[in-house]
């Protein structure tokens, strides 16, 4: 099995987050790793509680992983600086799964062996689904900041909720439906095309729900085009779309591919407005200002919504928060801490079955005062909150409206 490089950040007793921790492979071990047999007992070591944070810290979607991890670490540092949870400090176990599902499971298992008692992660959809399946065996409290596939928290085929899993972001179906509603009801489009990557849970989930909702409203889907993993030339699909004369194109893909698609759309003469989901976050710099004009996408957070968070992020990392995944990481950490607080208040031992169940129960019934909005969780463990619609002005994403 291919080893992957991981990074581990620790919160010291003073609450200082290490910018770069010990580098290890997910399948390996380090001086702080607990044995598999002692993993539950090791969840609380003295006055610390071990919390796992995982995501793609390298690779094609590392901009999301870094953003989530930094956002989560920022909140956990603040908790530690304010005395921790009933006096206990939080120790972070951070792993880089490189955007790969197999590596993600390896990372999860490694952190369980090291004494993890709750998980913030994963970040993108496919690795998250792999970890969800593994986490059920441990009833591990798990909050993903940003994975949007419905199956992350709920299996529609069996009508089963993944009892230990929650998310801070909205779902793929929600995004697809919201953008179809916005296109038809707010922008007045009646003819739309779709271009998406086939075989990818996120892309296909948004595309399917956009199509179903748009048609249910009375709109016409004039064309649906797909492409495969690794494709970089989209001109054939875009030329076909051009010939069908849509008023808009829904492009539920990640920012790097979206940038290529917008550029190639311009080159073939397809200049209608494009729409997208939260995978567009980070798109600036991958497309020109003209290519971004009159485009819209949905997101959990809009810049300027919470100056306290934005100022704290800049003070901690020396730069502005990179995209909306940092606020989601912050809120995912806040959700986990909400559950940990309840378990600690009950006097339970970290890592035990009762402790983990107390964390899960508290989150399920709680109200989280997050920076992406105040939210509760519905029966599928998805957050109930509003959606930000963003557009681009001079190449920068700005809030158009809440919808």
Q: Residue spans of the language-model regions?
A:
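Short, low-complexity disordered leader/linker segments with a strong preference
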Residues: 1-50, 403
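Extracytoplasmic "Venus flytrap"
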Residues: 45, 52-71, 95-101, 123-124, ...
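Segments of small-molecule ligand-sensing domains
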Residues: 316, 320-323, 337-399
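Extracytoplasmic ligand/sensor domains, especially the bilobed periplasmic-binding protein
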Residues: 116-223, 273-297
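Beta-alpha junction/loop-to-helix N-cap segments that form part of ligand/metal-binding clefts
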Residues: 63-68, 82-154, 227-232, 264
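Extracellular/periplasmic periplasmic-binding protein-like sensory domains
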Residues: 262-330, 397-399
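Periplasmic-binding protein-like
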Residues: 53, 111-123, 143-145, 193-196, ...
């Amino acid at each position: 099995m291919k080893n992957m490089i991981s990074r581990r950040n620790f919160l010291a007793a003073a609450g200082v987050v290490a910018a770069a921790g010990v580098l290890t492979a997910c399948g390996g071990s380090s001086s702080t790793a607990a044995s598999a047999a002692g993993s539950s007992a090791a969840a609380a070591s003295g006055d610390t509680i071990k919390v796992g944070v995982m995501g793609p810290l390298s690779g094609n979607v590392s901009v999301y992983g870094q953003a989530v991890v930094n956002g989560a670490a920022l909140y956990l540092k603040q908790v530690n600086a304010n005395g921790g949870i009933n006096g206990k400090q939080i120790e972070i176990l951070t792993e880089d799964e490189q955007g790969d599902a197999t590596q993600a499971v390896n990372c999860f298992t490694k952190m369980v062996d090291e004494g993890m008692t709750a998980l913030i992660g994963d970040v993108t959809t496919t690795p998250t689904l792999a970890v969800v399946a593994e986490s059920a065996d441990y009833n591990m409290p798990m909050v993903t900041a940003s994975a949007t596939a419905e199956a992350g928290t709920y299996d529609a085929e069996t009508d089963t909720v993944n009892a230990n899993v929650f998310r801070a972001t909205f779902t793929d179906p929600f995004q697809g439906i919201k953008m179809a509603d916005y296109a038809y009801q707010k922008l007045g489009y009646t003819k739309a095309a779709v271009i998406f990557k086939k075989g990818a849970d996120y892309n296909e989930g948004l595309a399917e729900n956009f199509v179903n909702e748009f048609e249910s409203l009375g709109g016409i889907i004039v064309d649906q085009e797909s492409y495969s993993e690794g494709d970089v030339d989209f001109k054939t699909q875009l030329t076909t779309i051009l010939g069908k004369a849509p008023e808009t194109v829904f492009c539920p893909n990640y920012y790097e591919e979206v940038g290529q698609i917008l550029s190639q759309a311009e080159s073939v003469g397809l200049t209608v407005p494009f729409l997208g989901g939260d995978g567009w976050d980070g798109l600036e710099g991958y497309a020109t200002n003209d290519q971004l004009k009159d485009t819209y996408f949905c997101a959990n957070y809009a810049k300027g919504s919470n100056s306290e968070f934005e100022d704290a992020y800049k003070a901690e990392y020396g730069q502005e928060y990179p995209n909306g995944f940092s606020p989601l990481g912050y809120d995912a950490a806040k959700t986990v801490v909400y559950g940990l607080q309840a378990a600690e208040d009950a006097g339970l031992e970290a890592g035990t079955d009762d402790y983990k169940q107390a964390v899960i129960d508290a989150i399920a019934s709680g109200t989280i005062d997050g920076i992406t909005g105040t939210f509760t969780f519905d029966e599928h463990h998805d957050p109930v909150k509003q959606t930000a619609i963003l557009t681009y002005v001079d190449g920068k994403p700005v809030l158009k409206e809440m919808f």
